[in-house]
Amino acid sequence: MSFTVLIPARLASTRLPDKPLADIAGKPMVVRVAERAALSGAERVMIATDDARVQQAAADHGHAAILTRPDHPTGTDRLSEAVDALGLPDDAIVVNVQGDEPLIEPALIDAVAAQLVAAPHADIATCACPLADAEALFNPNVVKVVCAADRRALYFSRAPIPWARDALAGGARVLAPGLPAWHHIGIYAYRVAFLRRFPALSQGQLERYESLEQLRAMEHGHVIVVHHTDSAPAAGVDTPADLERARAAYTNRL
């Protein structure tokens, strides 16, 4: 199985300025992400950034980075530019690992790539784990996904789906026993042909209402398959508290 890992790393961040360059045990966060990705089965790991400072930081630690335009509306648009710059063929597979995931498990990267390889009818693969509890089911910041028997995604939503009618009658807020409710994990594998088409896809109503980019692909008829894992991976770094947690994790490993 051959695939490339691309790590989009945008320097601007409202909650954590210069996030890709934040120090984690002596190295920039984006370098820590690249190190984790390099432990997967990827043939190549490449950082895609909008700032020369990130590119230089990667080079200083022996990692490749490509400089992309600063005006991309989404990380997926940035990937589209990167695959063209790298000259990847349409049938190649790219795994998108976010630049704020310094605790990503290499095995999860491999599993998502393998899920796409096993589904030639699909353009995208992603990942999900069982919902932890009723609080997660009703939390709009926890994205839910429902799947067909063949692991094809039927819908992603911030709403509590599937809706257990009887268990939730009368306003109850419970996680019904046996409910096939999955917590979406934002790691993606793409076929390069899809990434090249993505910038031309118009944003649909579902994406606008839910604010979920993956719905754009589904609204345009593209198939997403979902790898199921038993437990949620470590969360990414979005806040100063998240950064301290990641630093502590690395300190404990050293």
Curated annotation (Swiss-Prot):
Keyword Nucleotidyltransferase: yes
GO terms (BP aspect): CMP-keto-3-deoxy-D-manno-octulosonic acid biosynthetic process; lipopolysaccharide biosynthetic process
Domain of life (superkingdom): Bacteria
InterPro entries documented for this protein: Cytidylyl_trans, KdsB, Nucleotide-diphossugar_trans
Reactions catalysed, as given in the entry: 3-deoxy-alpha-D-manno-oct-2-ulosonate + CTP = CMP-3-deoxy-beta-D-manno-octulosonate + diphosphate
GO terms under cellular component: cytosol
Compartments (UniProt record): Cytoplasm
Gene3D superfamilies: Spore Coat Polysaccharide Biosynthesis Protein SpsA, Chain A
Any one GO molecular function term: 3-deoxy-manno-octulosonate cytidylyltransferase activity
EC number: 2.7.7.38
Pathway field: Nucleotide-sugar biosynthesis; CMP-3-deoxy-D-manno-octulosonate biosynthesis; CMP-3-deoxy-D-manno-octulosonate from 3-deoxy-D-manno-octulosonate and CTP: step 1/1; Bacterial outer membrane biogenesis; lipopolysaccharide biosynthesis
Enzyme class label: transferase
Pfam families associated with the record: CTP_transf_3
Keywords: Cytoplasm, Lipopolysaccharide biosynthesis, Nucleotidyltransferase, Transferase
HAMAP family in alphabetical order: KdsB
Family to which the UniProt record says this protein belongs: Belongs to the KdsB family.
Function statement: Activates KDO (a required 8-carbon sugar) for incorporation into bacterial lipopolysaccharide in Gram-negative bacteria.
Protein name: 3-deoxy-manno-octulosonate cytidylyltransferase
Organism this protein belongs to: Bordetella parapertussis (strain 12822 / ATCC BAA-587 / NCTC 13253)
Gene that specifies this protein: kdsB
